[in-house]
Amino acid sequence: MKISYFLLLILSLGSSQINPVSGDDSIQCFQKNNTCHTNQCPYFQDEIGTCYDKRGKCCQKRLLHIRVPRKKKV
């Protein structure tokens, strides 16, 4: 009985070491300080690539372009 508990413990610890973010595209996305989403990017972020072995989307914060009115030359 003790052996079965020990084997169950070893199996659960071994399976917890599997990394779901092991894809190369995910690593590149996180290195550029972007985020990965499985569905769609939030409305304030733009999709720039893939994550999770092309099953998700790599999202980057959208840059807001604010136009400053220029003074007219007289």
From Swiss-Prot:
InterPro entries: Defensin_beta-like (IPR001855). Disulfide bonds join 29-58, 36-51, 41-59. Its main location: secreted. It is found in: Secreted. Only expressed in epididymis (caput, corpus and cauda). GO terms for cellular component: extracellular region. Residues 1-23 form the signal peptide. GO terms for biological process: defense response to bacterium. It comes from the Eukaryota. Keywords: Antibiotic, Antimicrobial, Defensin, Disulfide bond, Secreted, Signal. Belongs to the beta-defensin family. Has antibacterial activity. This is Beta-defensin 39. It comes from Mus musculus.
